[in-house]
Each structure stands twice: as structure tokens, then as C-alpha cells.
From Swiss-Prot:
The modification Phosphoserine is found at S124, S143, S155, S157, S260, S325, S375, S420, S544, S660. The gene is PALM3. It is found in: Cytoplasm; Cell membrane. This is Paralemmin-3. GO terms for biological process: negative regulation of cytokine-mediated signaling pathway; regulation of cell shape; response to lipopolysaccharide; Toll signaling pathway. Its main location: cytoplasm. The modification Phosphothreonine is found at T151, T301. Residues 123-137 have a biased composition (Polar residues). Residues 392-477, 487-532 have a biased composition (Basic and acidic residues). It is a lipid-anchor.
Length: 673
């Protein structure tokens, strides 16, 4: 039945095509006749002009009118010719549309054969013009796959249904694809490859179509255009959507299986998957959105850390995205499919960070370099690179003390450390911060072991976030560091250390002992009061109340490393223990390490100070920390969360002490003045 209806439809289409071709031929003849008339008119006008020229030179002025008089019939003839050519054009485009309606041809590979078939074209139109017109119509039709644009009434969209009814059989034949790909003609680019596969599968029916026609020129057109019709119908069909969904699900499933074990490889693959989904489906299909939604779910399941990292990335990019889930980041926050693509980029970012963290525990140097290269902030990356060796040393110590089992916990700790900056930015993440604090307390002992690497990464990512956010809460850490050297200038040399914070942190430690003695003299307390008061207010306003709690606990955990950087970040405690009055902070700044250990908010720091230096810090770092303990303003501890990264520089501290000591002394003089 389907065959007979198809055959009847084909006959109708052929008859319509013949009619259109006849009209086209008639229009061509008319155009030829009009052109001949124009030639005759031109000759006549030329003859008249010649006669008038020969008659006398006086009538020459009237030559223009005379030439224009014949020009008026000529102009009319030219207008008629243009009209005829336009009608011819429309007829040809109708013919092409008819062919495409019957065969689903979506672009013009067969346009030239059809022209050739219709004979030589004396018209001024070029093949390119005809093809372009036909193609625009066809593209319109392709963009509206449900109905054919401009299809003549004689060829209703029944052929579609017939074709669809007839094709399911061939469509299930997988092997028929490759052989007739030339006959198919290229599938229009916007259509994804699964549809192409469908169209190729539908090709066998096309062969039968040619036979039924009994050959001839028209069958050539049929075969040339056939496959692309299947592209059109397949593109809209539920079969194609199901197929795309299958493909995507298979890919995601494979990657899920492969990747849940090793995160970095999985992350790389997943990045590929997401992009493939977008390119293949074009981002307009609900399936595509669903798949992309599923991808983040996979991410979520594979690594809880990655989820935190995604939220951190979302907050870094400053987009007000619901932070409950990566999908919230992607689709809700970015607002649409293009936004989803942006979200894909964001996921890539955060996944790279996850990779870096995972690899960072395994290979500290690699992590340092990758973070240097890939971290959005090139400058911070450079700083990170400077401290890679310290990272390696600290991380190895951390790994030894913590063991592999605790590596993951430091990983979470890192995320929590990163989340603490995020907490400052977004009070909403306070829950995460609370969790991170909880896990931080659990990890307290291990973190004390691993606090230095954690602090390192915290500092690195703290810098990343601080500079990325541009928030003064985040910058609170670095602004306090920056502003204290800038405003205080006790640490004139510290401005340079901030340029190379990681290497110079050790130097600062060295110089801190000297400087902090002087600072305790009262200059540091005074200027810490100033900086703490100002930046403390800023950070209090900006929500470092939350951050202060989280970072206070982090300080407690990272106590000694925190002290290491306390010099540059005495103000930071100002904001963060700002639950404490600034006066208390100043007192603490003046107090020796005993005060630091006895601090109420830093009460946790006391055990951590005792524990941390022993397991983790190298012999060099330990004396530095102990020296700094008294010298550093205990109030600065919250910031040094990031400091531990730079403390590890064991060899640097001695040189740094020498270098930064005198520098800071001079700077302190400047600051005193």
C-alpha cells in the first residue's frame, strides 16, 4: 500500500514538474523574443540617429530626445524582460521546491544538473544566482521542518507521510549507509551526524524510487535529492532524538564508568563530552539539556569536592548562581542554552582545579605548575610557580604525616579552605563553611600535619579568589597584606615580598622576627590598629564575620603557618577575629606567642601550634614559626591560612631573613617616619 501511494505521489510530482518545466520553457521563449525586440529597437534607433546625423548638425541637440524616444520602448522592453526573468526565476525555484518537497532535498547539489537538463540558459542569471535563491528557500524550509515553505499546492506534504511510512524498514537496516553516500550528496551542515546516518539508511528506498520511475532524467534528480529528504524528515523525527539521546547516554555512561575511579582522566573526558553534546545537538534539544544536566550529576557523584569546586567557580565568576548544585550553576544561573555553554566552560575550569588538587596531592610539583599555568590569574600562577618547591616540600611532609588516607581529607580541607573565602563572599555558603569547619576540626590533627600544603593551596586559591572576586572580603586577606605594607610601610620590603609572596614569606618570617620585635615596640600595633580598624570594618561589612569564624578555625588549624604570615596579615585577624575588639587585637599584636596561644578565638591554635610544627614543619620552618609565634601578631593568623604555602621554603627562610630583615627595617623606619 505504501508503495502504491508513493508511486502515485511520484507520478503527481512528475506531472507537476513537467508543468513547471513547460512554464519555464515558455517564459524563456518570451524572454528571448523580448530580447530580439530590444535588439531590433536598438538597431532602429541607431539607424535613425545615423540618418539624423547625416541630415544636419543642427538637429544633434534633438538627437538625445530621439535616442531617448526609442529608449522608451527599449526601456519598456527591458522592464518586460526583467519581469519575465523574475517569473522564470520563481518558476525554477518552485520546481526546485517541488523536487525538494518530494525528495526532501535540502540543498542544491542537484541544482546544476536540473539546470543542465533544462537546456542552455541565455538569460543573464548565473547558476550561482539560481542556486542561491533555491538554497535560501530550501534553508527556510529546512528551518521549518514540519511544513514545506512555498510548496506548490499540487504537491501536498503527503509525500512526507508516505516517505516516512515507507522508510522505517530501510531505516532499520544499518549496513546500507556507506555505499550510496555520493548519491546522497552532502547532508546540510547544521544537521547532526546521527541524522546523517538515518538519511543514509533511508537510501535503499531511494534506489527503488528510481526503478519505479523507470529511469530518465527525473530519476537522476530523485536519486540526487533523495537522501537529503531523509535528513529533513529524520532530523525532526522522534527516532533521531532517541538516537541522539542514546549516543549521548552511552558516551556519558562509558565515561561515568571509566572516570568515577580516576577523577582527572574522567574530568578531561567529561569536558569533551559536554562539548560534543553541544556541537552535535546544537544546544536546542531538550535531550541535550537533559544530558548536560546529567553530566553535572555525574560530576557530583564522582567527587563531592568537585561540587564545592563548581560552586566556588561560580562564585569566582561573580555570577549569582544558585549554589545548590552544578546544574543550578549551569542552566539556572547562566539562563539559557548559550548560558549553558558558558556553564560548560565553568565546569571545565572547576574540573581543572579538581584535577590540580587531586594531582597536587599525588604530584605537588605538577599541581603547582598546572595551577600556575591554568589558574585564571596568570600573575598568581607565577607566584605559585615561584613556590612550587616549597609546595613539594610541604606536600611531601604532609603526605608522609597524613598518609594517603588523609590525602582526600586534606583535599576536602582545601575545598573547605577555598569555601571559606567563598563564605566571606556569599553568606549563603555559610553552611558549606560550617561543614568545612566540621571536617576541618575532624582533620584538625591530620590537617595540622597537612595544614601547610593545605594552607599553601589555600593561599594560592585564596589569591586567585581574592583577585578574581575583587571583593574586599577576599582582598581583605591580600588587601590587608597589600595595604599593611603600603599604608604601614613598616614592611617596605614586604611590598616586594608580596610580589613574590611565596618565596618572600619565608624571608618575611626571617624579617618578621626582627621587625616584629620592633613592631611590638608599638609601631606595628599602632598601624595594625589602623589597618585592622579600617580593613576590619571593611571586612566586617563585607561579611568576614562569617569568614572570620571559618578562617579563625582555619587559623586554629593552621596556627603556626598562620603565624608565619601574621606579619603581613595582622590586619586580617583584625577583620576576622573582629568579634574581638581591635584593642584586643592590638594587645594580641603586642603579646608574644603565649598570647597567641592563649587567644580566645584562637584557642584552638594552641594545640595546633604545638602539634603542627612538630609533624609537618621542617626544622628550619619550626624555628621560624616559633620565632614568629612571639613576633607575629597572633591576630594575623586567619590570613596565614594561605601563608603555610610560603613557609615551607626551608632554604629561602635563611636567605630571606637576611634579605627581608634589613629591607623591612628600612621600611619600618620609613613607616615610623
Amino acid at each position: 500500500m505504501a508503495e502504491s501511494s508513493l508511486y502515485r505521489q511520484r507520478l503527481e510530482v512528475i506531472a507537476e514538474k513537467r508543468r513547471l518545466q513547460e512554464e519555464i520553457r515558455a517564459a524563456r521563449r518570451e524572454v528571448e523574443e523580448e530580447k530580439l525586440r530590444v535588439e531590433r529597437l536598438k538597431r532602429k534607433s541607431l539607424r535613425e540617429r545615423w540618418l539624423m546625423d547625416g541630415a544636419a548638425a543642427v538637429p544633434e541637440p534633438s538627437e538625445d530626445p530621439t535616442s531617448k524616444d526609442p529608449q522608451s520602448p527599449e526601456g519598456q522592453a527591458q522592464a518586460r524582460i526583467r519581469n519575465l526573468e523574475d517569473s522564470l526565476f520563481t518558476l525554477q525555484s518552485q520546481l526546485q521546491l517541488l523536487q525538494s518537497a518530494s525528495t526532501g532535498a535540502q540543498h542544491k547539489p542537484s541544482g546544476r544538473p536540473s539546470w543542465r537538463r533544462q537546456g542552455h540558459r541565455p538569460l543573464s542569471q548565473s547558476i550561482v544566482e539560481a542556486g542561491s535563491v533555491g538554497q535560501t528557500d530550501l534553508n527556510k524550509r529546512a528551518s521549518l521542518p514540519a511544513g514545506l515553505v512555498g510548496t506548490p499546492p499540487e504537491s501536498p506534504s503527503e509525500p512526507r507521510e508516505d516517505v516516512l511510512g515507507f522508510l522505517p524498514g530501510p531505516r532499520q537496516v544499518p549496513g546500507a549507509a556507506g555505499d550510496s553516500s555520493e548519491a546522497n550528496g552532502p547532508c546540510p551542515s547544521p544537521i547532526p551526524t546521527p541524522e546523517q546516518g538515518l538519511s543514509q539508511r533511508a537510501v535503499p528506498s531511494e534506489g527503488r524510487v528510481g526503478e519505479a520511475k523507470g529511469g530518465g532524467v527525473v530519476s537522476v534528480v530523485w536519486e540526487g535529492l533523495r537522501a537529503t529528504e531523509d535528513c529533513a524528515t529524520g532530523a525532526t523525527g522522534p527516532e533521531l532524538e532517541a538516537k541522539v539521546e542514546e549516543v549521548v547516554l552511552e558516551a556519558i555512561g562509558d565515561r561515568k564508568g571509566a572516570g568515577s575511579l580516576e577523577l582527572p582522566a574522567w574530568v578531561k573526558e567529561d569536558r569533551g563530552i559536554v562539548e560534543v553534546v553541544w556541537e552535535g545537538v546544537g544546544g536546542s534539544d531538550a535531550e541535550a539539556m537533559g544530558e548536560i544536566g546529567r553530566v553535572p550529576e555525574v560530576v557530583q557523584t564522582s567527587s563531592p569536592r568537585l561540587q564545592e569546586r563548581l560552586e566556588a567557580a561560580a562564585s569566582i565568576e561573580g555570577e549569582d548562581v544558585p549554589q545548590g548544585s552544578p546544574e543550578g550553576d549551569g542552566q539556572g544561573g547562566s539562563g539559557g542554552e548559550e548560558g549553558s555553554f558558558i556553564w560548560v566552560e565553568r565546569v571545565t575550569l572547576s574540573e581543572e582545579w579538581e584535577e590540580l588538587l587531586v594531582e597536587g596531592l599525588e604530584g605537588p610539583e605538577v599541581a603547582g605548575r598546572e595551577r600556575g599555568d591554568e589558574s585564571p590569574l596568570g600573575a598568581e600562577g607565577a607566584k605559585t610557580g615561584g613556590g612550587e618547591e616549597t609546595w613539594e616540600a610541604e606536600k611531601r611532609k604532609a603526605e608522609e604525616s597524613m598518609g594517603i588516607g588523609s590525602e582526600e581529607k586534606p583535599g576536602t580541607g582545601r575545598d573547605e579552605a577555598e569555601m571559606s573565602p567563598v563564605v566571606e563572599r556569599k553568606g549563603g555558603e555559610k553552611k558549606l563553611e560550617l561543614e568545612s569547619r566540621g571536617s576541618a576540626e575532624k582533620l584538625g590533627t591530620e590537617r595540622e600535619g597537612g595544614e601547610e600544603p593545605l594552607g599553601i593551596e589555600r593561599k594560592v586559591e585564596g589569591h586567585l579568589r581574592a583577585e578574581k572576586e575583587g571583593d574586599e572580603e577576599k582582598r581583605g586577606a591580600e588587601e590587608e597584606e597589600v595595604e599593611e605594607p603600603l599604608g604601614v610601610e613598616k614592611k617596605g620590603g614586604e611590598e616586594e615580598p608580596e610580589a613574590t609572596k611565596e618565596p618572600l614569606e619565608a624571608e618575611r618570617k626571617g624579617g618578621e622576627e626582627t621587625l616584629e620585635a620592633e613592631k611590638r615596640g608599638g609601631e606595628e600595633s599602632l598601624e595594625t590598629e589602623k589597618t585592622q580598624g579600617t580593613e576590619g570594618d571593611l571586612n566586617l561589612e563585607q561579611g568576614s564575620r562569617e569568614g572570620s569564624e571559618s578562617q579563625a578555625e582555619e587559623m586554629n588549624e593552621a596556627g603556626p603557618p598562620l603565624e608565619a604570615n601574621t606579619e603581613t596579615r595582622p590586619e586580617k585577624e583584625g577583620p576576622q577575629p573582629q568579634e574581638k575588639p581591635v584593642g584586643a587585637l592590638e594587645e594580641e599584636g603586642v603579646k608574644p606567642q603565649t598570647a597567641a596561644e592563649g587567644q580566645g578565638p584562637l584557642g584552638d591554635a594552641t594545640p595546633l601550634l604545638a602539634e603542627t610544627p612538630a609533624p609537618e614543619q621542617p626544622a628550619e620552618c619550626q624555628p621560624l614559626l616559633q620565632g614568629e609565634g612571639p613576633s607575629a601578631n597572633p591576630s594575623a593568623h586567619p590570613v596565614p591560612t594561605y601563608a603555610p604555602a610560603r613557609q615551607p621554603e626551608p632554604s629561602a627562610p635563611t636567605e630571606g631573613e637576611e634579605a627581608s630583615g634589613p629591607k623591612q627595617k628600612t621600611c619600618q623606619c620609613c613607616a615610623v617616619m
